[in-house]
Structures are given as structure tokens and as C-alpha cells.
Amino acid sequence: MTGGRIYTHSLEKLMPGFAEEAPLERKVTKERVALMTETGVVNIEYASGKPDDANSASYTILRSKFDKWFAEKCEEVGVMMVPGIRVDSLLMDGDKVVGIDAAGEEMYADVVILADGVNSLLAQSIGLKPELKPEQVAVGCKEVIQLGEDVINQRFGVENGEGVSMLVAGDPTVGNIGGGFLYTNKDSVSIGIVATCSDIGRVDVSIPDMLERFKNHPAIEPLIKGGVPLEYSAHLVPEGGFDMIPKLYADGVLVTGDAAAFVINLGYTVRGMDFAVESGKLAAETVIRAKAAEDFSAASLSYYQKLFENSFIYADMKQYRNFPKLLERHEIFNDVPEIADVLFDRLFRVDGTKPVSLPMFAIDEIAKRTSAKKLLDLVMVALDAL
């Protein structure tokens, strides 16, 4: 499962021109970030109008279509795909991983690459990563709603092939840490909620109910009205950032993608698939090198760590390593949307009453909701995150 957007630069380097044949939905041409209260929304939209090159484009996708195409491409170059098998445990020879056990069937390999998601029980079983903490992960809940291509074009103000990405903080999660998202596909939309596990139970609203709340918001309901639900899914998402990255290698094993916590959430964008593609490529390069030397020890596979530390994954995640601390602040999901709502309401309201000084009005509203010390602390955390 994915929210529905892939930044294509890493896949473009691996498969130049792939976008010409891959089952991509729409190219993202409009970025929307919104602060939402129960009845209002403050929305920022950006559309550059500049042509994207292949390395800077991003697209919405549906994994059911995209993964099938991608698997077929892998098979074309000799990969044997074995879907539908649950790996129960790793086969060990002392401290060395030598294969997998799948429902009693043993499969041996020189190297096992773990890509089993953020809750990688396999990586935990050999001590590469600790058990997850609730504040390190979020639950993503998504629905795909059929609308029709022309309806999407009209409602979102786009042409055929053009798409919208929308990320929302505030009311969708009832002030919990997390947010809502909406991506336009060719003839459907992907809409969902992400809520940090440590906040579940903080309010008496379940994750599915949060999604319904989001869908019924006055700013969202007109966009999806009359749609037909096609699918429903849920997924655990890493939220801990750079400091959550585990040890990435051991004798006979490497860790990639979500299992390695290779995801960053910046509020205005969420990235994971481009990291997953790149980490898979780096793992493959490491195995090829190890095979040439017939050395699959931890010392040999540590080359993966070196490649990782010289990659854009490492650079991006290190740059924003303090962002999770900012997104742990409930003020962002409670006070900030409420303050933005009342400020913009005051800014645009014309009712014949005595005008007010907007700066003083803003100070007043902020003072009602938080102390100067807490506000200053939030500003300092934000500066540190950036």
C-alpha cells in the first residue's frame, strides 16, 4: 500500500524513460497544503507552470497496477517472482543468515534482502533493530473512490494527465498527530488518514471514523460526491526519521525500504518509494560485489552502509533528522489550524463592525491558546527542524 505518489528520479536513473510505458495515473502539477478546522480550511496551492524533466517529475500511482507492471519488467530480465508466500523466519548457520523458512519450506540464498515493512519481525529476530515504539510509527488508512476522468478534471481544475496532491493537518485527525491526504488518479482519487500510533486513544475517534470525518468535511465532500468506493487498505508507516534507521547489514543479510525506516514526512511532502527504489539498487550493487568475491560476511556487506552514506537517502534524511520532533507537537494539529482559521475569517470578514488591528488580533488569539514560552519553544523546534 502507498498513499499514492512516487517521485520518479531514482526509478528514472534505473530505467530511463520508464514513465512512457508504466501504468502511472497522473503527473502531479498542483501541490496543496491545508490547515483544517471542523468547518473551515486554509489552503495553499502551488503550480509552477514550468516543464518538469524526467528526474524531477512525480506521479500518482495505484500499486495494484504499478506493481504488476514492475514485476513483469523484473521477470523480463530473469527474476523469478514468488508472490503470496509468507516468510516465517530466517534460516541461520550460527550467526549467519543463509535463507528463509516459508511455512516449513526452506529456501537457501547467499544473501537475504529484508524488505518486509516497518515492523520487520525478521530484522528484529536477528537483533538488527529493536521493537517499534508507538511514537515511531503511524497507521495509514486509505480508500480509493471512483469518480471518472472528466469529473476529476472539472472538480480539481486540471487537464487530462494532470494531477493534484493534497496534504492536510488539523481536523481530519481530530487534533492528533498525523493528517489527511488526497491524490487524484486517472479516474479515481486516493483519500486517507495517517495517525501516529502513540496518539491512538487520545480522542474517542477511531482511525476509520477519522477517515469518514475527513471525507465529510465541507472542503472535501464536494470533491468526492457521488463517488464509488473501489478499495480500502491500511498500512504501518515509519515516522521516526533518521534516528530510527537500524543497523543495515549482518552476515548474509541486508535491510532496505520501510524495514530500514527510509521514509521522511515533512508535512508538505511524504517520501518513501524513491528511497525504497534507491535502497534496493544499492543492496543489489552490494550483493553483486559480494558475489564476485564470494564473500557474504558482514565485513563484505558493510559496503551497503558505505553506499547508503553517499546516497541522497542519507543526505535527505540527515538534513531533516529533527523534523519528527517538530511533528510531535500537538500545537501544529490543534492550535495552528484554529489560529489560522480565525485570522483568515477576520481578514476577509466585512460586517460593518469596528475594524481591528490584525497583528493585535493575532496576538490575542495566540495568547488564548498558548503561552509565550510554549510559542517560543515551538518556533525554536521549527527552526531546528529546518
Task: Please describe what each predicted stretch is.
Residues 20-24, 155-157, 225-227, 317-324:
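Short coil/turn segments at secondary-structure boundaries
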Residues 64, 68-69, 73-223:
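Predominantly flavin-linked oxidoreductase catalytic cores and closely associated redox partners
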Residues 282-334:
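Active-site-proximal substrate-binding core of FAD-dependent oxidoreductases
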Residues 327-386:
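C-terminal auxiliary extensions adjacent to catalytic cores
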